[in-house]
Amino acid sequence: EVFKSGYVTYSNKSKRKLLGIKKNILMKHGAVSEQIAREMAKTAAILARTDVSVSTTGIAGPDGGTPEKPVGLVYIGCNVCGRITVKECHFNGNREKIRESTVSAALSLMRECILQYYSEVTFGGKEK
């Protein structure tokens, strides 16, 4: 199977209910954070019983941004066999453009993480 399941966890409540993200982590770091992207990628893989999972959390706008977390800030998490990578991104444009950029970046990160993992497993980290 290529796609086993997906979770849409827009609200903090759904992040807690569907993915079991702890309330104290959400309160400490906020929903748009490296820590939450990491927890989402970790938990999604466990719940789906899969080797690869991807998470995104961000502010697509047009509202919701702050000076510390502006519109366009996105964290993308990728979990490949328990190895989790999180990338911070800053995208420009309207809500639709930010969402499109997020999907493109998430797929690129997933590809990079899978290739890196299997390169290390197969070739000991050396390119063949």
Descriptions of predicted regions:
Residues 1-128:
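Short alpha-helical segments enriched in small residues
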